[in-house]
A protein has these predicted regions:
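Surface-exposed loop/turn segments and immediately adjacent short secondary-structure elements
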Residues: 1-89, 95, 103
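Inter-domain linker/hinge segments that demarcate the starts of reverse transcriptase
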Residues: 13-26, 53-61, 107-112, 135-148, ...
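A short acidic-Thr-Gly-centered motif at the start of a beta-strand
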Residues: 18, 22-23, 83-84, 138-155, ...
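Mobile genetic element proteins and their domesticated derivatives, centered on retroelements
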Residues: 20, 24, 34, 54, ...
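Short helix-interrupting loop/turn segments at helix-coil junctions
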Residues: 30-35, 52, 64-70, 85-87, ...
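Conserved catalytic palm subdomain of right-hand nucleotidyl-transferase polymerases, strongest
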Residues: 30-38, 87-96, 134-178
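Conserved pre-motif C helix in the palm subdomain of viral-like polymerases
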Residues: 89-120, 135-141, 162-165, 214-242
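Conserved polymerase palm-domain catalytic core
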Residues: 161-260, 267-276
Length: 283
C-alpha cells in the first residue's frame, strides 16, 4: 500500500511518482471517456513513459494551480429513465470527465481524505470508509428501542436536502476549507479547477455550447463527495453551536445521525429541535 505524504498547511510537498503510478493503475476500465475520447485502458497501457509524463504534468499543476483546458471540461450525456421520454424529467444526466485528469484527481483525493476524515464529526455514515448506513440504521433502531423501553420521549426530524450536491456555494466551500486549516496549496489547486470548469451537452452526436457552473460540486468528479462532506460539516457545526443535546446512549450525547446527505435530528423535547435544525428546513 502506498503511504501518502502528510501535507500540512505550510508544506508544498511535491507529488510523488508512486502516487501517480498508484492512481494510473487504479483507473476504472470499460467506462465512457471524456471530451478527449481517451479511455482509461489507453492511459494504463502507456506504462512507465506515461507515468513519468503524468508525474511531470501533475507536479506542474500542483506548483502553479493551472489545469490543462481538457482536464477542466465535462461532457454531459443523457440517459433515459422510465416514463414519457418527451419530458426532460424522465432523463438523468451523467458528466464525463477525461481520464488523464482523473490521475491527478485521485492523487488530490488521497491527500484530501485524511484531512477531511479528521474534520468530519462521528455522525455521518455512507460517505466514508468503514461507516455504512446499515450500521447507522441499526444504531437508530437500538436508540429508539431503548427510549421506548424506558417510556421516554424521543423526537426526530428528518431532513432531505433537495439537490444537495448542486447547491454547494463555492466561495463558502473554500472559506470553510481555510477555516478548517486544509493545506493552502491543495485548496488553491481545487479552487482553480472549479474556476475553469466548463461543461457541454452531448446529444445525437453533436455537442452544444460550453457553459460555466458557479454553484454545486462537479458531477462525476472524484473529489465531490469529500468536498460536499466538508461543506455539510460546516453547516452542521454552525447549526448545532451551543446546542448540548439531551439524547444519550452509552454515555454519549447524540444530536443527529447522518445518512449520506440526509439528516436525522433528534432530541428529548420537541422544542429542542426547532432552534438548531429549523433554519436548515427553510428552502
Amino acid at each position: 500500500m502506498l503511504t501518502v505524504p502528510l501535507v500540512t498547511d505550510t508544506d508544498n510537498y511535491p507529488i510523488l511518482r508512486e502516487e501517480v503510478e498508484a492512481a494510473v493503475k487504479s483507473l476504472e476500465k470499460r467506462k465512457s471517456p471524456g471530451i478527449d475520447n481517451t479511455p482509461g485502458e489507453l492511459v494504463q497501457a502507456g506504462g512507465d513513459a506515461v507515468i513519468s509524463a503524468f508525474h511531470k504534468i501533475c507536479n506542474k499543476i500542483w506548483q502553479t494551480g493551472q489545469w490543462p483546458i481538457p482536464w477542466t471540461q465535462s461532457r454531459i450525456i443523457t440517459l433515459p429513465k422510465k416514463g414519457n421520454l418527451q419530458q426532460c424529467k424522465n432523463y438523468r444526466t451523467v458528466s464525463l470527465i477525461c481520464y488523464p485528469s482523473k490521475v491527478l484527481l485521485k492523487v488530490l483525493l488521497n491527500r484530501l481524505k485524511p484531512q477531511a476524515e479528521s474534520t468530519i464529526a462521528e455522525e455521518p455514515a455512507g460517505v466514508r470508509s468503514g461507516r455504512s448506513t446499515i450500521e447507522q440504521i441499526f444504531s437508530l433502531r437500538i436508540l429508539c428501542e431503548r427510549y421506548l423501553q424506558h417510556q421516554q420521549e424521543l423526537y426526530h426530524v428528518f431532513i432531505d436536502f433537495k439537490k444537495a450536491f448542486d447547491r454547494v456555494w463555492h466561495k463558502a466551500l473554500w472559506s470553510t476549507m481555510r477555516l478548517y486549516n486544509f493545506n493552502v496549496n491543495l485548496i488553491h489547486v481545487i479552487e482553480n479547477l472549479y474556476n475553469k470548469t466548463n461543461s457541454a451537452v452531448y446529444l445525437n452526436g453533436d455537442i452544444g455550447d460550453w457553459f460555466r457552473t458557479t454553484v454545486g460540486v462537479r458531477q462525476g468528479c472524484l473529489l465531490s463527495q469529500s468536498l460536499f462532506n466538508i461543506f455539510l460539516e460546516r453547516i452542521m457545526t454552525d447549526a448545532l453551536e451551543d446546542h448540548q443535546g439531551t439524547v444519550s446512549i452509552g454515555g454519549r450525547t447524540i444530536t443527529n445521525l447522518r445518512f449520506a446527505d440526509d439528516i436525522d435530528g433528534m432530541a428529548g423535547k420537541e422544542e429542542e429541535l426547532a432552534k438548531p435544525l429549523g433554519p436548515m428546513m427553510i428552502s
